[in-house]
Amino acid sequence: GHHDIAYGLSLGGKILSRILERNEIVIKHSILDAAPLLPLPRWLVTPLKYYQCANVWTCYHWTGFWRWVFHSHYFDVILDECKKAYPFGGSKAVLDGYTSVYTTKLESISGSDIHYWYGTKEAFVARPQVSHLTSLHPETKVEVFKGMNHGQLLIDKPEEVAQRIMRMQYE
């Protein structure tokens, strides 16, 4: 298959990186937004995967709470997806998924135009990812967003993300 543009934030970026690693689909422009590309220290894997599982569980069971906390269409979409997906895999699927995310290392990557985005507030985590990615693909274009934290650009400025993606399409 062939795609013009693919964007993945965090876990979505990890999934996109795995697609690029396998080189099964040609993607003209790829954006990895704060994607975890390196394994975490072993001691951190279990607490983080249970933390993420709790997040997904609360998205499924306490949807109204999250809609109240985050007044954003983006969160409505995420919450709706959790409501659809969680009943089919439950906690085990979430735990298995995050175990894979947190323990695998990107070994290779293919693509003609790869971008890595992250915010300055997550730089301590993102810099090693960028270093690893640029060692595999030196032409990677890295963009750092001042004052932004993990996922904040998409949540707070979805129109800016859309505009950047549209510009890429016509480059």
Residue map of PLM features:
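Conserved acidic catalytic loop of the alpha/beta-hydrolase fold
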Residues: 1-4
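Gly/Ala-rich beta-loop-alpha elbow adjacent to hydrolase catalytic centers
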Residues: 7-16
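Flexible "cap/lid" loop of the alpha/beta hydrolase fold
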Residues: 21-57
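Conserved alpha/beta-hydrolase catalytic His-Asp/Glu region
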Residues: 58-108
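Short beta-strand/loop motif that positions the catalytic acidic residue
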Residues: 110, 116-118
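Conserved loop-alpha-helix segment in the C-terminal half of the alpha/beta-hydrolase fold
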Residues: 118-148
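Catalytic histidine-centered segment of alpha/beta-hydrolase-like enzymes
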Residues: 148-159
